[in-house]
């Protein structure tokens, strides 16, 4: 399927969210299409976290006009805004990525199957509510996964999440990143 815009390409990548790494062809197409997109924040916010998110960030950095910044200086542009709800959204994406990566093989397959029901939503605007719903479902599939993640990664990897709280300190019903309609 031909890619007409950067968003088309990103949406194709989104269908692989958490499921697989990018193929060489995907990377090549992504590089080519994204080189035409100038709005880096808009582009970055439309890319769900993937297993190999850092590689995608590096591709973005290589292809978009950020030459005046080092990769490490540019990285926060992709990850955080001053809005606390968007920070939690970002950290939840990283947490979900790590949950899938660290799940036991059978549980990982179950998580990947469960994720299929959310793919249509992941292709559009991802809300904090949706990400929290996915988190709850994944933690039901492998109840000890939170402890597993924290054994491998320090809680400071997800600075806006509160691991002392059952809901990680995320309340989607009041913590919306979108203005009420």
Curated annotation (Swiss-Prot):
Q: Taxonomy-wise, where does this protein's organism fall, top ranks first? A: Eukaryota, Fungi, Dikarya, Ascomycota, Saccharomycotina
Induction / repression: Repressed by the negative regulatory complex REP1-REP2.
Phenotype upon changing residue 180 to S: In strain: ATCC 7754
Keywords of this entry: Plasmid, Plasmid partition
> What is the protein's known function?
Plays a role in 2-micron plasmid partitioning. Antagonizes transcriptional repression of recombinase FLP by REP1-REP2. Regulates both stability and copy number of the plasmid by blocking the formation of the REP1-REP2 repressor complex.
Record GO cellular component, one term: nucleus
GO biological process per UniProt:
plasmid maintenance; plasmid partitioning
Annotated consequence of substituting residue 116 to S: In strain: ATCC 7754
Tell me the protein's name: Trans-acting factor D
Report the domain of life of the source organism.
Eukaryota
Name the gene: RAF1
């Amino acid at each position: 399927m031909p890619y007409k815009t950067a968003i088309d390409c990103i949406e194709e990548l989104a269908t692989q969210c958490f499921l697989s790494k990018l193929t060489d062809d995907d990377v090549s197409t992504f590089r080519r299409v994204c080189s035409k997109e100038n709005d880096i924040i808009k582009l970055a916010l439309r890319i769900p976290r993937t297993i190999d998110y850092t590689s995608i960030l590096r591709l973005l950095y290589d292809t978009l006009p950020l030459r005046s910044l080092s990769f490490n200086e540019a990285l926060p542009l992709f990850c955080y805004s001053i809005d606390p709800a968007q920070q939690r959204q970002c950290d939840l994406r990283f947490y979900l990525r790590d949950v899938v990566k660290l799940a036991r093989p059978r549980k990982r397959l179950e998580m990947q199957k469960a994720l299929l029901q959310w793919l249509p939503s992941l292709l559009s605007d991802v809300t904090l509510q949706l990400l929290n719903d996915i988190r709850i479902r994944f933690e039901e599939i492998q109840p000890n996964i939170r402890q597993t993640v924290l054994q491998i990664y320090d809680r400071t990897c997800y600075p806006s999440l509160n691991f002392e709280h059952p809901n990680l300190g995320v309340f989607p019903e009041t913590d919306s990143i979108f203005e009420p309609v």
